[in-house]
Amino acid sequence: MKVISALLLLIVIVATACDAVIIRDQLNPIPQSASPTLVIIPTKETVLDATYSHQLGVEVIYFAAGCFWGTEKLMQSIPGVDAAVSGYANGLAEIVPTYEQVVSGATGYRETVRVEYKPDVISLDALVFAYYHVIDPTIANAQGYDVGTQYQTGIYYADDAARETVERITAIERQRNESFVVEIKPLERFYEAEEYHQ
């Protein structure tokens, strides 16, 4: 019962945390004349997640659920989650993204949270169900008041075992919704967001 109450409380936090982003962006909009500077990477090989060091007894999954601040707070509150780190996933291989580039909508990156969890405490099934409980899987490129390609929902997995679990739970969720636009893909690359987003 405590877990359910905590999840419901966190849904409220998720819903309200992202509103602050809209207000902040409206107060300090990026000028129309501003163009993001692209940082070119010499190769196009898959980066995956160079900032993550695998730990014994810990697994990892990546959730894009709109604004990453609310998702990060939600995941951090779940027992068995060791860490939730905001970042950017699966965009153009040619750039190392910054927040300004991602919000421009030109990079293909999604605001994403890397969730490091202990499967002997919390199952991936439970995390995926919690994820689907807080998103609207029927809306592309938006969640709540946050609109843009960076807010596209998605689950990005790092191995076949996670893929099988994600696909199984997603099949259940697809039956509940006539329209379903959540990306289910392997992780191609992930970069941690700037420190002020953590």
Regions found by a protein language model. Give the residues of each.
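Flexible coil/turn and secondary-structure edge motifs
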Residues: 18-198
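Bacterial N-terminal signal peptides
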Residues: 6-15
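Positively charged n-region of N-terminal signal peptides that target proteins for export
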Residues: 1-4
